[in-house]
Amino acid sequence: HGLSLSVPEGKVTSIIGPNGCGKSTTLKALARIWPCYKGNVTFNGEDIKKFSHREFAQKLAILTQAPQSPADLTVKDLVEMGRFPHRNWFGRKSMEDDAHVEWALGQTNMLGMQHRLLNTLSGGERQRAWIAMALAQRPQVLLLDEPTTYLDICHQLEVMQLLEKLNRELQLTVVMAVS
């Protein structure tokens, strides 16, 4: 049951397969959520175990299949959470954090919705908010587990077009699991 996977930098890579084949497990291993007991996972040639949690979170962001949040969280509150790996010891926001949050909201067309509660958004809007949070993290790699599974076809297209735009304009490496 070995796996060898090389992800080209600045490209979109899809891991495709039926339910239960290990797509989510692979993403979680890449993100250090689940440990690799055999073999290793490297990032730019370095074993991912060598990075501190903070360093690794500055390099890689992951969105799971069905992310959860408190009901009273606004879009902006969620996106600000993406800046935690970059904050100082006391967790205070900086002007740089504010700029990255604003940038991420703009990239995902969520600036006009930043004060709305997440639970008032459509499925596609909510997914864009979560992607904005990951972008605020300013990762080199974005892992997405079934990013369009729970969306209707119009919202699926909207999310996929956003990912294509981010990849093209930012050279963001995207790895996604899809059925």
What positions do the PLM features span?
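Conserved catalytic motifs of ABC-family nucleotide-binding domains
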Residues: 138
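Catalytic Walker B motif of ABC-type/P-loop ATPase nucleotide-binding domains
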Residues: 142-146
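Conserved ABC ATPase signature
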Residues: 117-121, 125
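Conserved ABC transporter NBD signature motif
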Residues: 39-47, 56
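Conserved ABC ATPase "signature" region
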Residues: 80, 95-113
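Helix-to-loop junction immediately C-terminal to a conserved catalytic motif
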Residues: 31
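The feature captures the beta-strand-to-loop junction immediately N-terminal to the Walker
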Residues: 16-18
